[in-house]
Amino acid sequence: MLFRSDVTDGFHPVSHHGDLPERLEKLVKIQKWHMQQFADFLKKMADTPDGQGSLLDHAVFMYGSNMSNSNQHSNYPIPNLVVGGGNGKLKQGGQHLVLPERTPIANVHLSLMQKVGLERDHFGDSTGVISEF
């Protein structure tokens, strides 16, 4: 996939950067492009009226990675964004949550599923829910 005119490499090979500056530079460009696509999408959702709010108010999106450092195949810590109002079921307002080390990402998935009304008590390797949502 062509991310930018100056980055023609695929994401996966670039993510295994070997701490080489030229690969890290490409990785940053690709990740910035990804984030810009997500931001553009969220703006469209926020700008689209839906009932008493916007589509973004009535939805929830999670954006992130399954790796912290893909070069090392490290899974912790994993930065993720949770955006949207979940139809009034999610706390809003710029929270920054730092979960205990080695908290399974499945706990976030399970928590969001429960918040939007899916009756599940387990998902993947979940060990609990995130009450701060």
Regions found by a protein language model. Give the residues of each.
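Ligand-binding pockets and gating/stacking loops
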Residues: M1-F133
